[in-house]
Structure formats: structure tokens, C-alpha cells
Amino acid sequence: MGHLLMLWVAAGMCYPALGASAWSVNNFLITRPKAYLTYTASVALGAQIGIEECKFQFAWERWNCPEHAFQFSTHNRLRAATRETSFIHAIRSAAIMYAVTKNCSMGDLENCGCDESQNGKTGGHGWIWGGCSDNVEFGEKISRLFVDSLEKGKDARALVNLHNNRAGRLAVRASTKRTCKCHGISGSCSIQTCWLQLADFRQMGNYLKAKYDRALKIEMDKRQLRAGNRAEGRWALTEAFLPSTEAELIFLEGSPDYCNRNASLSIQGTEGRECLQNARSASRREQRSCGRLCTECGLQVEERRAEAVSSCDCNFQWCCTVKCGQCRRVVSRYYCTRPVGSARPRGRGKDSAW
């Protein structure tokens, strides 16, 4: 594989040990032709990118995107269509599409390359299509084949999962931007050559996190949920899917209480979690994480002071090294702890992922 994959291999991420992503890829290989082996490394990379981005986006939330959640999202016994599951399906589908598209454009995969279908055509006043456009069509095709094939159900939950898979792929399409290069005498830029390029995946993660924050709950009664693949079950859900919602994340069921430990749902609770307080570079939401993770879950915020060592007083020495000293300083870190003698923390119950 090429540069994109090598970056992750250099970071110590070996594909046979990718955990949740490898689990999903293995599920796919059971039912797919051996020809698709060509793309499994790129798909596994994409799945891992999705996991890491999910962890980043939810690092300071009560539900912090544990890696096992990516396994549970395809496990028949644990197929709850919650707000969190909607994000998992979307980010995984988007990340796989992203990784395959980038590897394709770099020439790392067989049977695909840059999208040159528009090259030479006039795109607008003063510019023409050219260069190497990212092949999002191919990336979307492979993502759909891999991810959607994991959904074996035919009930309302399955349709919701497939909808969110597609919303993730639409997020990748929404991130494409036109990049141009000037041509002309003495840099006059009399004409430009332009191509389509995917944005950094962090932008897609931010986009999908915003979709998660305002995800739409589809109201269905228990009779409709049990309808399975009967006509009334499919029709009831189809009626809810208006064209305007195709890029939105949707869910059916409220979230469990993420404040408290629940072994049956593999929820660890927030006790022992670190939170941010007085951090200058933190966002407003991150600044409020101690209240969200600790106080609102019936826990207290405990300050722990520790010595941190960092490089400082660096000087360039001829030739050609940089020598640094070591500086020590005391830093404060904050954790959610249970008050002495208190009972189990009490959270807000349903929809308490915030």
C-alpha cells in the first residue's frame, strides 16, 4: 500500500490486530468473492480511522466511543438503534470510503486511479478540469459493498443503520473541494486547471458530530418495531424518510444511562474519567466536561497534581543538531470520583450521552 497506509503502519497499527475493524472485515470476507481481498487492507485502515476519529470527537462526552462499540453495532443481540449507534455507522462508512478513495488516487489499488472523466472539459469561466481528482465514486462503491453487507437484518433497525451508512458517505461527498493551479505567462493565471480533492478527515468528523448533536428520532411504536420485514414495518419507516433527511443521522431508541456502570451493556460509567478544567486551549464544550462527566452524574471533581517533564531551552548547534534541556513543572489534572460513603452515582437516565 502507499503513503496513507504507511503512515498508520509507522504508528504501530498492524492490520491483523485492528480489533473491531478486523472483526468487521472478517465478517465481510465470509460472504464475498476472493477478488475483494485486494481492498481489505484499505478497508481495515478506513475502519481504524473511523474508530480513532470517533474517540477524538467523544473524548469529553459521557459516551466516549469505546472500541467494542464498533463490534456491537453489527451484533444481532446488541443492535439498538440509538443516537450513538447512528454515529458509529456513519463514521465507519465515511472513513472506509475516505481511505479507499485516497488509496485509489495514489495508485495503491488495482483497477482504479484518479477520476479523469472530466479532464479537458471547461468547468467555468477561466478554468478547465484537469489533474488528479479523488475518485469518490469508486470509494463510495467499495464502502457500500463492505459496510452495507454487514447489515443482515430486514427490520426497522436495519433500515436505520443502512440510512446512517449512506449519510456517512454523503458526508464524504460534501467535503470535496475544488483545488486549482494557475497557468499563464509570468504567472498571470489567465487560465486555471482544477480538480476535486477530499478535505482532511477531521473536517468530516466535525461534520458528522454536528449531525449527531441534532440527530432525528424516528417515532415508532413497539408493534411497528416488531413488524420486521413485513410490509407495514418497512412502509412505516419509509414514510419517515423524507428526501430532506437523507444526509441526517436518525435513530429509533433513546440512549442508556452512560453515567453508571452497566456490565450487561458494556458501559463503564464516568467514575474515574478525566475531565478538563481551566484549560486555555479547550473549546467551550470541553471546558464544561467536568460538570457533564462528574457533577451531573453524582460524582465529585478531584484535582490531582503531578510533575510533568518537557523539552525546553532548545538550541541549534553547528552542525547539525538541536539540543534541549528538560523542564519540570507541576500540572493539575481532574478526575471524576465518588464521594466517600456515597451510593452509586445517579445520572439522568435516558438520552444521557451529553
Curated annotation (Swiss-Prot):
SMART domains: WNT1
One GO process term, biological-process aspect: Wnt signaling pathway
Record carries keyword Secreted: yes
Listed GO CC annotations: extracellular region
Induction remarks: By retinoic acid.
Keywords, ordered alphabetically: Developmental protein, Disulfide bond, Extracellular matrix, Glycoprotein, Lipoprotein, Secreted, Signal, Wnt signaling pathway
Modification after translation (UniProt): Palmitoleoylation is required for efficient binding to frizzled receptors. Depalmitoleoylation leads to Wnt signaling pathway inhibition.
Function (record text): Ligand for members of the frizzled family of seven transmembrane receptors. Plays a role in embryonic patterning.
Name recorded for this polypeptide: Protein Wnt-8a
Organism: Mus musculus (Mouse)
